[in-house]
């Protein structure tokens, strides 16, 4: 932007990670490189191969045209009907069997660490993995009827994910690892807060603490209305809650908790701004709403917005993301320049 002095976007993002005030509202795609699962479907050990081969657990994944490129378990082919059979039916992968070094070399080829934080996305937390193995309905029934068996499976999954951390750290040397485990819908949690705290949270906490022990900053990704769990997220040790949707009361959460846990998101991803039909003016208006409403505190918030193409076309997705990120950067830089001018 004309008149803008040299600016270190990575340093700005690091301030955000340290829960400090930032001169510029952070943007998840500027000064931060998202690798692994998140930008794409990530290592095949978690989401299967592009050729349709199953993941390390034996689950086959497909990318429906209406899913914006996101992989889902192949419909009608769940591996597990009875949670009590998980030891016989489910393969817990050995992270040593996957070529993390080759995956990292490919993903890091065009990344400049001097300019960017490295954030590795590690998909399929314990609840999502249970749903991938059984389907959501059977997974929820298993949680209600056989919590001891579910807990035993969650222990095994978490053991694997913590072992994988060492391979990820060696190959990627990430600053951040994001743990993906959607436990909510747009309206509410899939399970009661008590059930979450008894059955799911201990495994989240164990993984987050394993990251911290290795010097890695742990992020927690959860779509949906999960604001009731913010204090649990803090207790687990998550640095940030990412992909926070507008259904949560971010305007209240940031000043209350933003010096302890960061909030990343704010975009109305389930409203018109998240659709392929949004106009440029609607995108600009949503950028301003998010920045003005959540960025005004100067801490505890990073912008993250996206919209879905109709058929998952990567070129269209890149165009959509370029528009959103570009408008967000122009607006946030303008806000920063206004503050600098007012301070002089």
Model region roles, listed by residue range:
Residues 1-32, 91-344:
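Active-site loop segments of alpha/beta catalytic cores
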Residues 3-6, 47-51, 76, 151:
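Alpha-helical interaction segments
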Residues 18-20, 24-64:
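N-terminal accessory/capping or targeting/presequence segment of soluble
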Residues 38-42, 65-69, 73-74, 131-132, ...:
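Short aromatic-enriched loop/helix-cap "lid" or pocket-rim segments at secondary-structure transitions
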Residues 51-101, 111-117:
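A contiguous, low-structure linker/loop signature
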